[in-house]
Structure formats: C-alpha cells, structure tokens
From Swiss-Prot:
Organism: Listeria monocytogenes serovar 1/2a (strain ATCC BAA-679 / EGD-e)
GO MF annotation: an example: metal ion binding
Pathway of action: Purine metabolism; IMP biosynthesis via de novo pathway; N(1)-(5-phospho-D-ribosyl)glycinamide from 5-phospho-alpha-D-ribose 1-diphosphate: step 2/2
Domain ATP-grasp as annotated: residue spans: 108-314
Taxonomic lineage from the root: Bacteria, Bacillati, Bacillota, Bacilli, Bacillales
Name of the protein in its database record: Phosphoribosylamine--glycine ligase
Keywords for this protein: ATP-binding, Ligase, Magnesium, Manganese, Metal-binding, Nucleotide-binding, Purine biosynthesis
Length: 420
C-alpha cells in the first residue's frame, strides 16, 4: 500500500521511516517533507501541511491507503476532518478533539471536570488581573500562552521579575500573537518529568514506551524552553507502577472524557507528566506524537507500525509491542541562537561521516544547488543510537555529534545523564 505523512520535521521523518519498514508498504510520501528524508527513500510531495484540497487530490491520485497527520497546526485546522469527509482514511484527531492541545484553558477545565491530576491554575485575559494573581501566588510559578506557540509558550519563573516579564511579553507585547491573549497561570510542580504517549481510539488506550525530553536549551536544564533538545526511551528511574498509575488515572479518564464531551479522539495522545510526591500529574497534553520523543520511541516498536495504524482506523485491536530491553538516545543539533534568533542557510559539515548504525532524522535542513545540506530551521536534525545501557549509548553517540561540530550550531552534552 501507499501511505502519506503530513509534516516536515524530524518527527515526520521518524514516522515515515518506520512505516517504510512495515510489511505491505510500497511507498511512503511526505507532504511537504524535507530534503533529508529522500536519503531514506521517502518521496516528497510539494504540498503544504494545511492545503486540504491539495492533500485530498494527491491522496486520491496516488491511491493512498491512509494518511498520518504529524504536526499540531494541521490537526487544529481540521485537515483530518477534511480528509475523512472526502472518504480518505486519516490517523489523527479531528479539530474538536485536537483542542486538548490547542487550548491550555480548555485542557485545564477538562481536567478539573474529570478529576485528572494537574497543577492548580487560573486563566486570564486581563493583564492587571493576571499580575495581581501573580503577586498573590508568588514564585516559583508557571505562565503559559493558551494557544499554540511551537513549544515555546511556557515560562517557568523562579523570580518575580521573570514572571512579570513573561506576562508582559505574552499579554501586552502579544509575543505569540492571538495564542497569548489568554494566559494560564499555574502552580509550579516539583518532580521528575516524563512523556507518556499512547495510541488512542475512542475509549481504547494503548500506551507506548515512555520517554524523557529535555526542554531547556542549555546544559543543566538552563535557558529558555525549546521544542526539545534531545530525548531517550525508556526512562529507567520511572517505575512500571508509576506508568500504570498514569494510564489508569490520566490516560483512560482522558480518553473516556473526550468521548463523553463529543470529542471522539482517534490518534496519538501525548501526556507530558511530572512525578510529584502525590503521584503523576499532567503538565500538558498534546494531540500528536512528540518531537523529539518520536525519534527515540518508534525505533523501540517491535510490531508492524503500518498494520497497527490500519487496525486502529478499522476499529480493530492493534498489535502493540515495544522492546523490553536496551534503550534509544537522541540528541538534537540546533542552530546557534535557537530558540530566539538564529540564521538559516548555514552549511552542515560532517554528515557523510556519521556511522551507519546511527539514525539521522532531518528536521530543519534542505539541500542547496550543489546538493549540500544547509540549515533551514531552529532544530536542524537529531542523531539517535540504540544501545544496551545509557552509558553505552552516550559513549557511542556523542563522538558522532562531535563530527557535526561547527560554530553555527550547538547541542546539549548532558542528554541522558540522569539515566546513567
């Protein structure tokens, strides 16, 4: 069968590559994809991820068996709705279900209604009221833009000055446009963070291997929040009992609650969780695969990925099996200055020297007229390595990262140290 993946990042590269490794899959197309995907025999289609008519037209012409929509923007713009209305099978939540990611305020109200553990919070549209609440609660405190901000709309403020500045940026300077006209202020939670993704079809939930993302730009979890600077899966210091508690108290009630609300969720539910003294609590929900978590979780999937998605689309029970031993480590190479101001068009060096057993997932790259790869985004690519232990993975992966050393790029050297 022929399949279509919508999106252009490292996540979509990982999804497409895993689909190609499935039985009965002839071709995988990616719209719009990126030039680096071609190296893995993924075929690019020059259609934007929100061009509904273009995607429908292509899916019909190329006899696409099903479409996987990767990023949050097309999900919230109703690309899955449009494909399904045109009679094309599409995996991902419809717009009304993707709202669990699209609005932090909606997610908070939903969690309160269904008693899903999360931090206490309040939502504001008035700057003066929000500032008064800040002063009343004190620091540390967390300030979130209500809408989509590419993973950068969250400030964990340890000082009041930082909290007020974040609030000003969002509400007065409109740093994230309409996304931050409404702001959620929530209590700071202390604990170990981890990502739990699951395949969801209505009330059916099939959890994946857990991962730990590294959101801050710099070593030691310092600097601004990013889309993610690296990840690994599984997370040895999070017990099976904690994962089971998260499934029972968070994922299942969420899936059931969404059905009850008339927001049937079929797709990937991503729970960004924190293990507190009172058990796991929700930091955020996403309505799709995480990036960079996908690049370290999907390589651990033992069952046939395309067959799994196909089963969910036909309301059948999927075969979901993950490796029980070893781990996968992934480190992001980012453009200097990311996540704030960075240049595009810088040449990547050392790519051809990367060991064959290290996976390269391209994100913000493209080829110039000479066929050389240049940067085309903040997060440029991710290298991933499977190994038996974290110290093996780090020992094997970081020399490969060093081959990419170049003043125009940077990466964190401490990804995975917590799991050693």
């Amino acid at each position: 069968m022929n399949l279509l993946v919508v999106g252009s990042g490292g996540r979509e590269h990982a999804i497409s590559k895993k689909l190609l490794a499935s039985n009965n899959v002839e071709k995988v197309f990616c719209a719009p994809g990126n030039d680096g995907m071609r190296l893995d025999d993924i075929q690019l289609v020059a259609i934007s991820e929100t061009d509904k008519a273009g995607l429908i037209d292509f899916a019909k012409k190329a006899e696409i068996a099903f479409v996987i929509v990767g990023p949050e923007v097309p999900l919230l713009e109703g690309v899955v709705d449009a494909l399904e209305e045109a009679g094309i099978k599409a995996f991902g939540p419809k717009a009304n279900a993707a709202l669990i990611e699209g609005s932090k305020d909606f997610a908070k109200q939903f969690m309160e209604k269904y008693a899903i553990p999360t931090a206490a919070s309040r939502t504001f549209t008035d700057y003066a009221e929000a500032k008064a609440y800040l002063n009343e609660r004190g620091v540390p405190i967390v300030i979130k833009a209500d809408g989509l901000a590419a993973g950068k709309g969250v400030t964990v403020a340890l000082e009041m000055e930082e909290a007020v500045l974040a609030l000003k940026d969002m509400m007065l300077e409109e740093k994230f446009g309409d996304a931050s006209l409404k702001v959620v202020i929530e209590d700071f939670l202390a604990g170990e963070e981890f990502s739990l993704m699951a395949f969801v079809n209505g009330e059916e939930v099939y959890p994946m291997s857990i991962a730990q993302d590294h959101k801050r730009a710099y070593e030691g979890d310092k600097g601004p929040n990013t889309g993610g600077m690296g990840a690994y899966s599984p997370v040895p210091h999070i017990s099976e009992a904690v994962i089971e508690e998260a499934v029972q108290k968070i994922l299942l009630p969420t899936a059931k609650g969404m059905v009850k609300e008339g927001r049937y969720f079929r797709g990937i539910l991503y729970a960004g969780l924190i293990l507190t003294a009172d058990g796991p609590k929700v930091i955020e929900f996403n309505a799709r695969f995480g990036d960079p978590e996908t690049q370290v979780v999907l390589p651990r999937l033992e069952s046939d990925f395309a067959a799994l998605i196909d089963a969910l689309l036909h309301n059948e029970k999927p075969d979901v099996r993950f490796k029980k031993t070893g781990l996968t480590l992934g480190v992001v190479l980012a453009s200097a200055g990311y996540p704030e101001h960075y240049e595009k068009g810088n040449k990547l060096t050392g790519l051809n020297d990367i060991a064959e057993d290290v996976a390269i997932y391209h994100a913000g790259t493209k080829q110039d007229e000479n066929g050389d790869f240049i940067s085309d985004g903040g997060r440029v690519l991710l290298l991933a390595k499977e190994a038996e232990t974290m110290s093996d993975a780090r020992t094997l992966l970081y020399p490969e990262m060093q081959k990419l050393d170049n003043p125009n790029f940077f990466y964190r050297i401490d990804i995975g140290t917590k799991a050693e």
